[in-house]
């Protein structure tokens, strides 16, 4: 399965709850009713500041949205996450017991929020490989095939991975393999 990519680049200081709510609402308005799998890619590369209230409204709310039951899979991937973004983002995700897939400013994969060490280990392995089946991941973790399958299914339900037939695909790999289908605008225009 290849999701359609909806990409938005943010270019301002994100410092109030109403700003965050407006931005999230505009993003969701543009992709919520799509009748296929979609991955929202939110680029923080040009965001000099994000406070806790905006992190809560944008990051945590979008992560919760992708976790809701939907007829079509939904994913969110945060790119360009810098050190100064991490404290507010980590705080809100941990407070809500959420986890999100991201990429730092150097293009390295990054998990944010609350997760078990085995989730981070499996996630890093899939990010390194791009895509892999259960046996390949089980060998690298190492875990039994059944335990690895259960773990990867749980990670898919958290929208950390995309399932494509018998393989699991990192969000970065899916993004690189798919052209941007829907360039989003922060103002919804």
Predicted feature residues:
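Short amphipathic alpha-helical interaction segments
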Residues: 52, 142-158
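Amphipathic alpha-helical interaction surfaces in cytosolic regulatory modules
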Residues: 11-39, 44-98
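N-terminal, leucine/charged-rich tether regions that mediate assembly and partner docking
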Residues: 1-13
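Short acidic, hydrophobic short linear motifs in intrinsically disordered regions
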Residues: 41, 128-141
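Short helix-capping/hinge SLiMs at alpha-helix to coil transitions
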Residues: 33-36, 126-130
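Short, cationic-aromatic polyanion-contact patches
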Residues: 163-189
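Short alpha-helical segments that sit at the start of domains
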Residues: 94-127, 147-150
């Amino acid at each position: 399965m290849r999701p359609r990519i909806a990409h938005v680049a943010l270019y301002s200081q994100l410092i109030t709850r109403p700003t965050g709510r407006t931005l999230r609402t505009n993003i969701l308005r543009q992709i919520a009713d799509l009748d296929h799998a979609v991955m929202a890619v939110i680029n923080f590369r040009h965001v000099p500041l994000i406070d806790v209230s905006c992190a809560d409204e944008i990051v945590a709310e979008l992560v919760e949205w992708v976790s809701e039951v939907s007829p079509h899979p939904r994913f969110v991937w945060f790119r360009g996450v810098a050190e100064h973004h991490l404290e507010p983002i980590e705080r809100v995700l941990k407070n809500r017991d959420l986890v999100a897939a991201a990429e730092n400013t150097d293009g390295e994969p990054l998990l944010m929020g609350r997760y078990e060490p085995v989730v981070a280990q499996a996630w890093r392995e899939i990010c390194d490989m791009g895509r892999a089946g259960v046996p390949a991941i089980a060998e690298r973790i190492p875990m039994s095939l059944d335990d690895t399958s259960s773990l990867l299914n749980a990670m898919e339900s958290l929208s950390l991975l995309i399932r494509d037939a018998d393989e699991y695909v990192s969000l970065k790999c899916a993004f690189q393999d798919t052209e941007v289908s829907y360039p989003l605008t922060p103002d919804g225009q």
